[in-house]
Amino acid sequence: MRTEWIAKRSGHKNVSQMHYGRQGIITEEMNFVAQRENLPAELIRAEVARGRMIIPANINHTNLEPMCIGIASRCKVNANIGASPNTSDITKEVDKLKLSIKYGADTVMDLSTGGGNLDEIRTAIINASPVPIGTVPVYQAVESVHGRIENLTADDFLHVIEKHAQQGVDYQTIHAGILIEHLPLVRSRITGIVSRGGGIIAKWMLHHHKQNPLYTHFDDIIEIFKKYDVSFSLGDSLRPGCTHDASDEAQLAELKTLGQLTRRAWGHEVQVMVEGPGHVPMDQIEFNVKKQMEECSSPPLNALDLDPLASNANEQMEKFNVLGPAPFYVLGPLVTDIAPGYDHITSAIGAAMAGWYGTAMLCYVTPKEHLGLPNAEDVRNGLIAYKIAAHAADIGRHRQGARDRDDELSAARYNFDWNRQFELSLDPERAKEYHDETLPADIYKTAEFCSMCGPKFCPMQTKVDADALTELEKFLAKEKEVVTQS
């Protein structure tokens, strides 16, 4: 689909959507996104130009169906897949991709660390994927030196980053925000550093006593991303791994650096989103979203004494010609740490709140989080939990049309249209399965009850006649008149 679109850009030094957006050009990708989101194409262009929205669309991912991530659009959900050294292969990973898309993933990240040839796995995933694919290049960098992190050089990192870009990866998590001076700040934490990529960079810095090479070579990464229109997903290496560690000095120090890197990328017209925590108590979620918005804008919003969550925030930001804030992309956050096996629930609670406050994309968490590699059923449960969270956030933010499907399903429920209820469900197969568990015969698909209330006690059988309501209103009016006169 995109081959002809991309051919027109041949020879351009910067092919990013942000670059074209700032020139006033509405790209084919922007038009496609506008139709998907039911938003004006000019709004999409303006949001991308300001850095408030990204369209992750590598020029080498030609079978991509473009989508957007930003506060002006629907809240999105990412699913993680990937082979490990002990399990999985190419076929299994492509199957996981298809399953993720089936259950509503808007983007998919390939987090493979082993299980075969990583380049072949990634290529197969990209070739099979109509949704954007993200990666964490430091994983393959470590694999290339057989796990000897101390042997990695800046060139090793850059080589892998460019390879991923050439293959068609749409966004890459770059752990450039963790600095050597941040490392002592984790001393008081219970869980230390829980980001795999962040842990790799931390070990490298501790061994060499040198600054993070992804930070010192950030401009080189920008040049790579310009050529292929790869979006930055700035990794939060110091995200909290438990509620005790949330919003601490280490996390906020890195966030400030991520804001600086965001502005540097924008200076070269490269797209950016910023990753966030993690494990956060409910009372700190609003603070975390607000803090990211403040830091990852140009200029930083706290310098303007501007509240990004105020009802007139967008109007004020336009008044001061503010760029951003960059889209926020959070993992969860989990609001409690005591429910292993149920962390798709503990995190979906936090995800719904984060989305309501303005987070643009939610990274799903499966029931296997902290316990093991998820299987197909775990992926399904995690994705549905997060589709619920994202949809609830859209309703809470009063996005245009967000509640239409809810209203349609409610009408079908009231009319006992069981098949229509199943069709409108986020997981039609599960809804039908639960209904048919006790009432499997086809005749019950038109029955005016389910097995909860049975045929005699369902309150929705009480259909209030319009004429009866009119008569009742007349009666109540007369009663009120009598009371008034007395």
Curated annotation (Swiss-Prot):
Q: In which pathway does it act?
A: Cofactor biosynthesis; thiamine diphosphate biosynthesis
User: Which residues make up the binding site for [4Fe-4S] cluster?
Assistant: 450, 453, 458
Enzyme class comes to lyase
Q: Where does substrate bind?
A: 80, 109, 139, 175, 195-197, 236-239, 275, 329
Cofactor, how bound (note):
Binds 1 [4Fe-4S] cluster per subunit. The cluster is coordinated with 3 cysteines and an exchangeable S-adenosyl-L-methionine.
Task: Please provide, alphabetically and separated by semicolons, the GO molecular function terms listed in this UniProt record.
Answer: 4 iron, 4 sulfur cluster binding; carbon-carbon lyase activity; zinc ion binding
Q: What does this protein do?
A: Catalyzes the synthesis of the hydroxymethylpyrimidine phosphate (HMP-P) moiety of thiamine from aminoimidazole ribotide (AIR) in a radical S-adenosyl-L-methionine (SAM)-dependent reaction.
Q: HAMAP family, from UniProt? A: ThiC
What protein family does this chain belong to? Belongs to the ThiC family.
Please give the name of this protein: Phosphomethylpyrimidine synthase
Origin species, per record, is Trichodesmium erythraeum (strain IMS101)
Q: What is the lineage of its organism?
A: Bacteria, Bacillati, Cyanobacteriota, Cyanophyceae, Oscillatoriophycideae
